[in-house]
Every structure is written in C-alpha cells, then in structure tokens.
Amino acid sequence: MLKNSFFSIILKEQEENKENRGSVEFQVVSFTNKIRKLTSHLELHKKDYLSQRGLRKILGKRQRLLAYLSKKNRARYKELIGQLDIRERKTR
C-alpha cells in the first residue's frame, strides 16, 4: 500500500496545477493509478475478462503516451519512469 499512497501524492501535486491536467505526465500518472487498481482487482477476480480487456486497453494507451514522451523529451520521460517505478519500454 505504500506505492498507492506515493502515487496519490504525485497525483495531488499535479492536480494542484489545474491547467496541467492535459499534460502527458498527468495522464500517465492517472493511467498508472487505474492500472494498479485493476491489477489488484484482477488478483481477486481472475475470471473477470472484461476488466482484463480494459486493463490491456489502458496499458496500450499508457505505452503510446510514454513512447511519445520519450521521443519529445527524454529527460522528462526518465524522471517520470523513476517516480512511478515502472519499467522502460522495450526498443526493437
């Protein structure tokens, strides 16, 4: 639960900047929170296939946003990945 409280703190920091809600970082943080909640839900309900599909869709959206951010600003990408404690995307 320590991770969840950490992410809510990051989310509150970014919510204070009302004009920043459309930023890539804010969207990635909110998608990460949704992913964590869905993952914990799916640990209890293994056969909830609709939630599995929703999780895959959110993962794809976050992956596309992170790819965009890594192309546009590599430093912000590295900082965000470090804050959220997620793996760097694979490159081909």
From Swiss-Prot:
Entry keyword Ribosomal protein: yes
InterPro entries per the UniProt record, alphabetical: Ribosomal_uS15, Ribosomal_uS15_bac-type, uS15_NS1_RNA-bd_sf
Predominant cellular place of this UniProt entry's protein: plastid
Subcellular location: Plastid, Chloroplast
Gene Ontology terms: biological process: translation
Domain of life: Eukaryota
Gene3D superfamilies per the UniProt record, alphabetical: S15/NS1, RNA-binding
Keyword field: Chloroplast, Plastid, Ribonucleoprotein, Ribosomal protein
UniProt-recorded Gene Ontology molecular function terms: structural constituent of ribosome
Cellular component GO terms, alphabetical: chloroplast; ribonucleoprotein complex; ribosome
Assembly mode: Part of the 30S ribosomal subunit.
Protein family: Belongs to the universal ribosomal protein uS15 family.
Protein name: Small ribosomal subunit protein uS15c
Phylogenetic lineage: Eukaryota, Viridiplantae, Streptophyta, Embryophyta, Tracheophyta
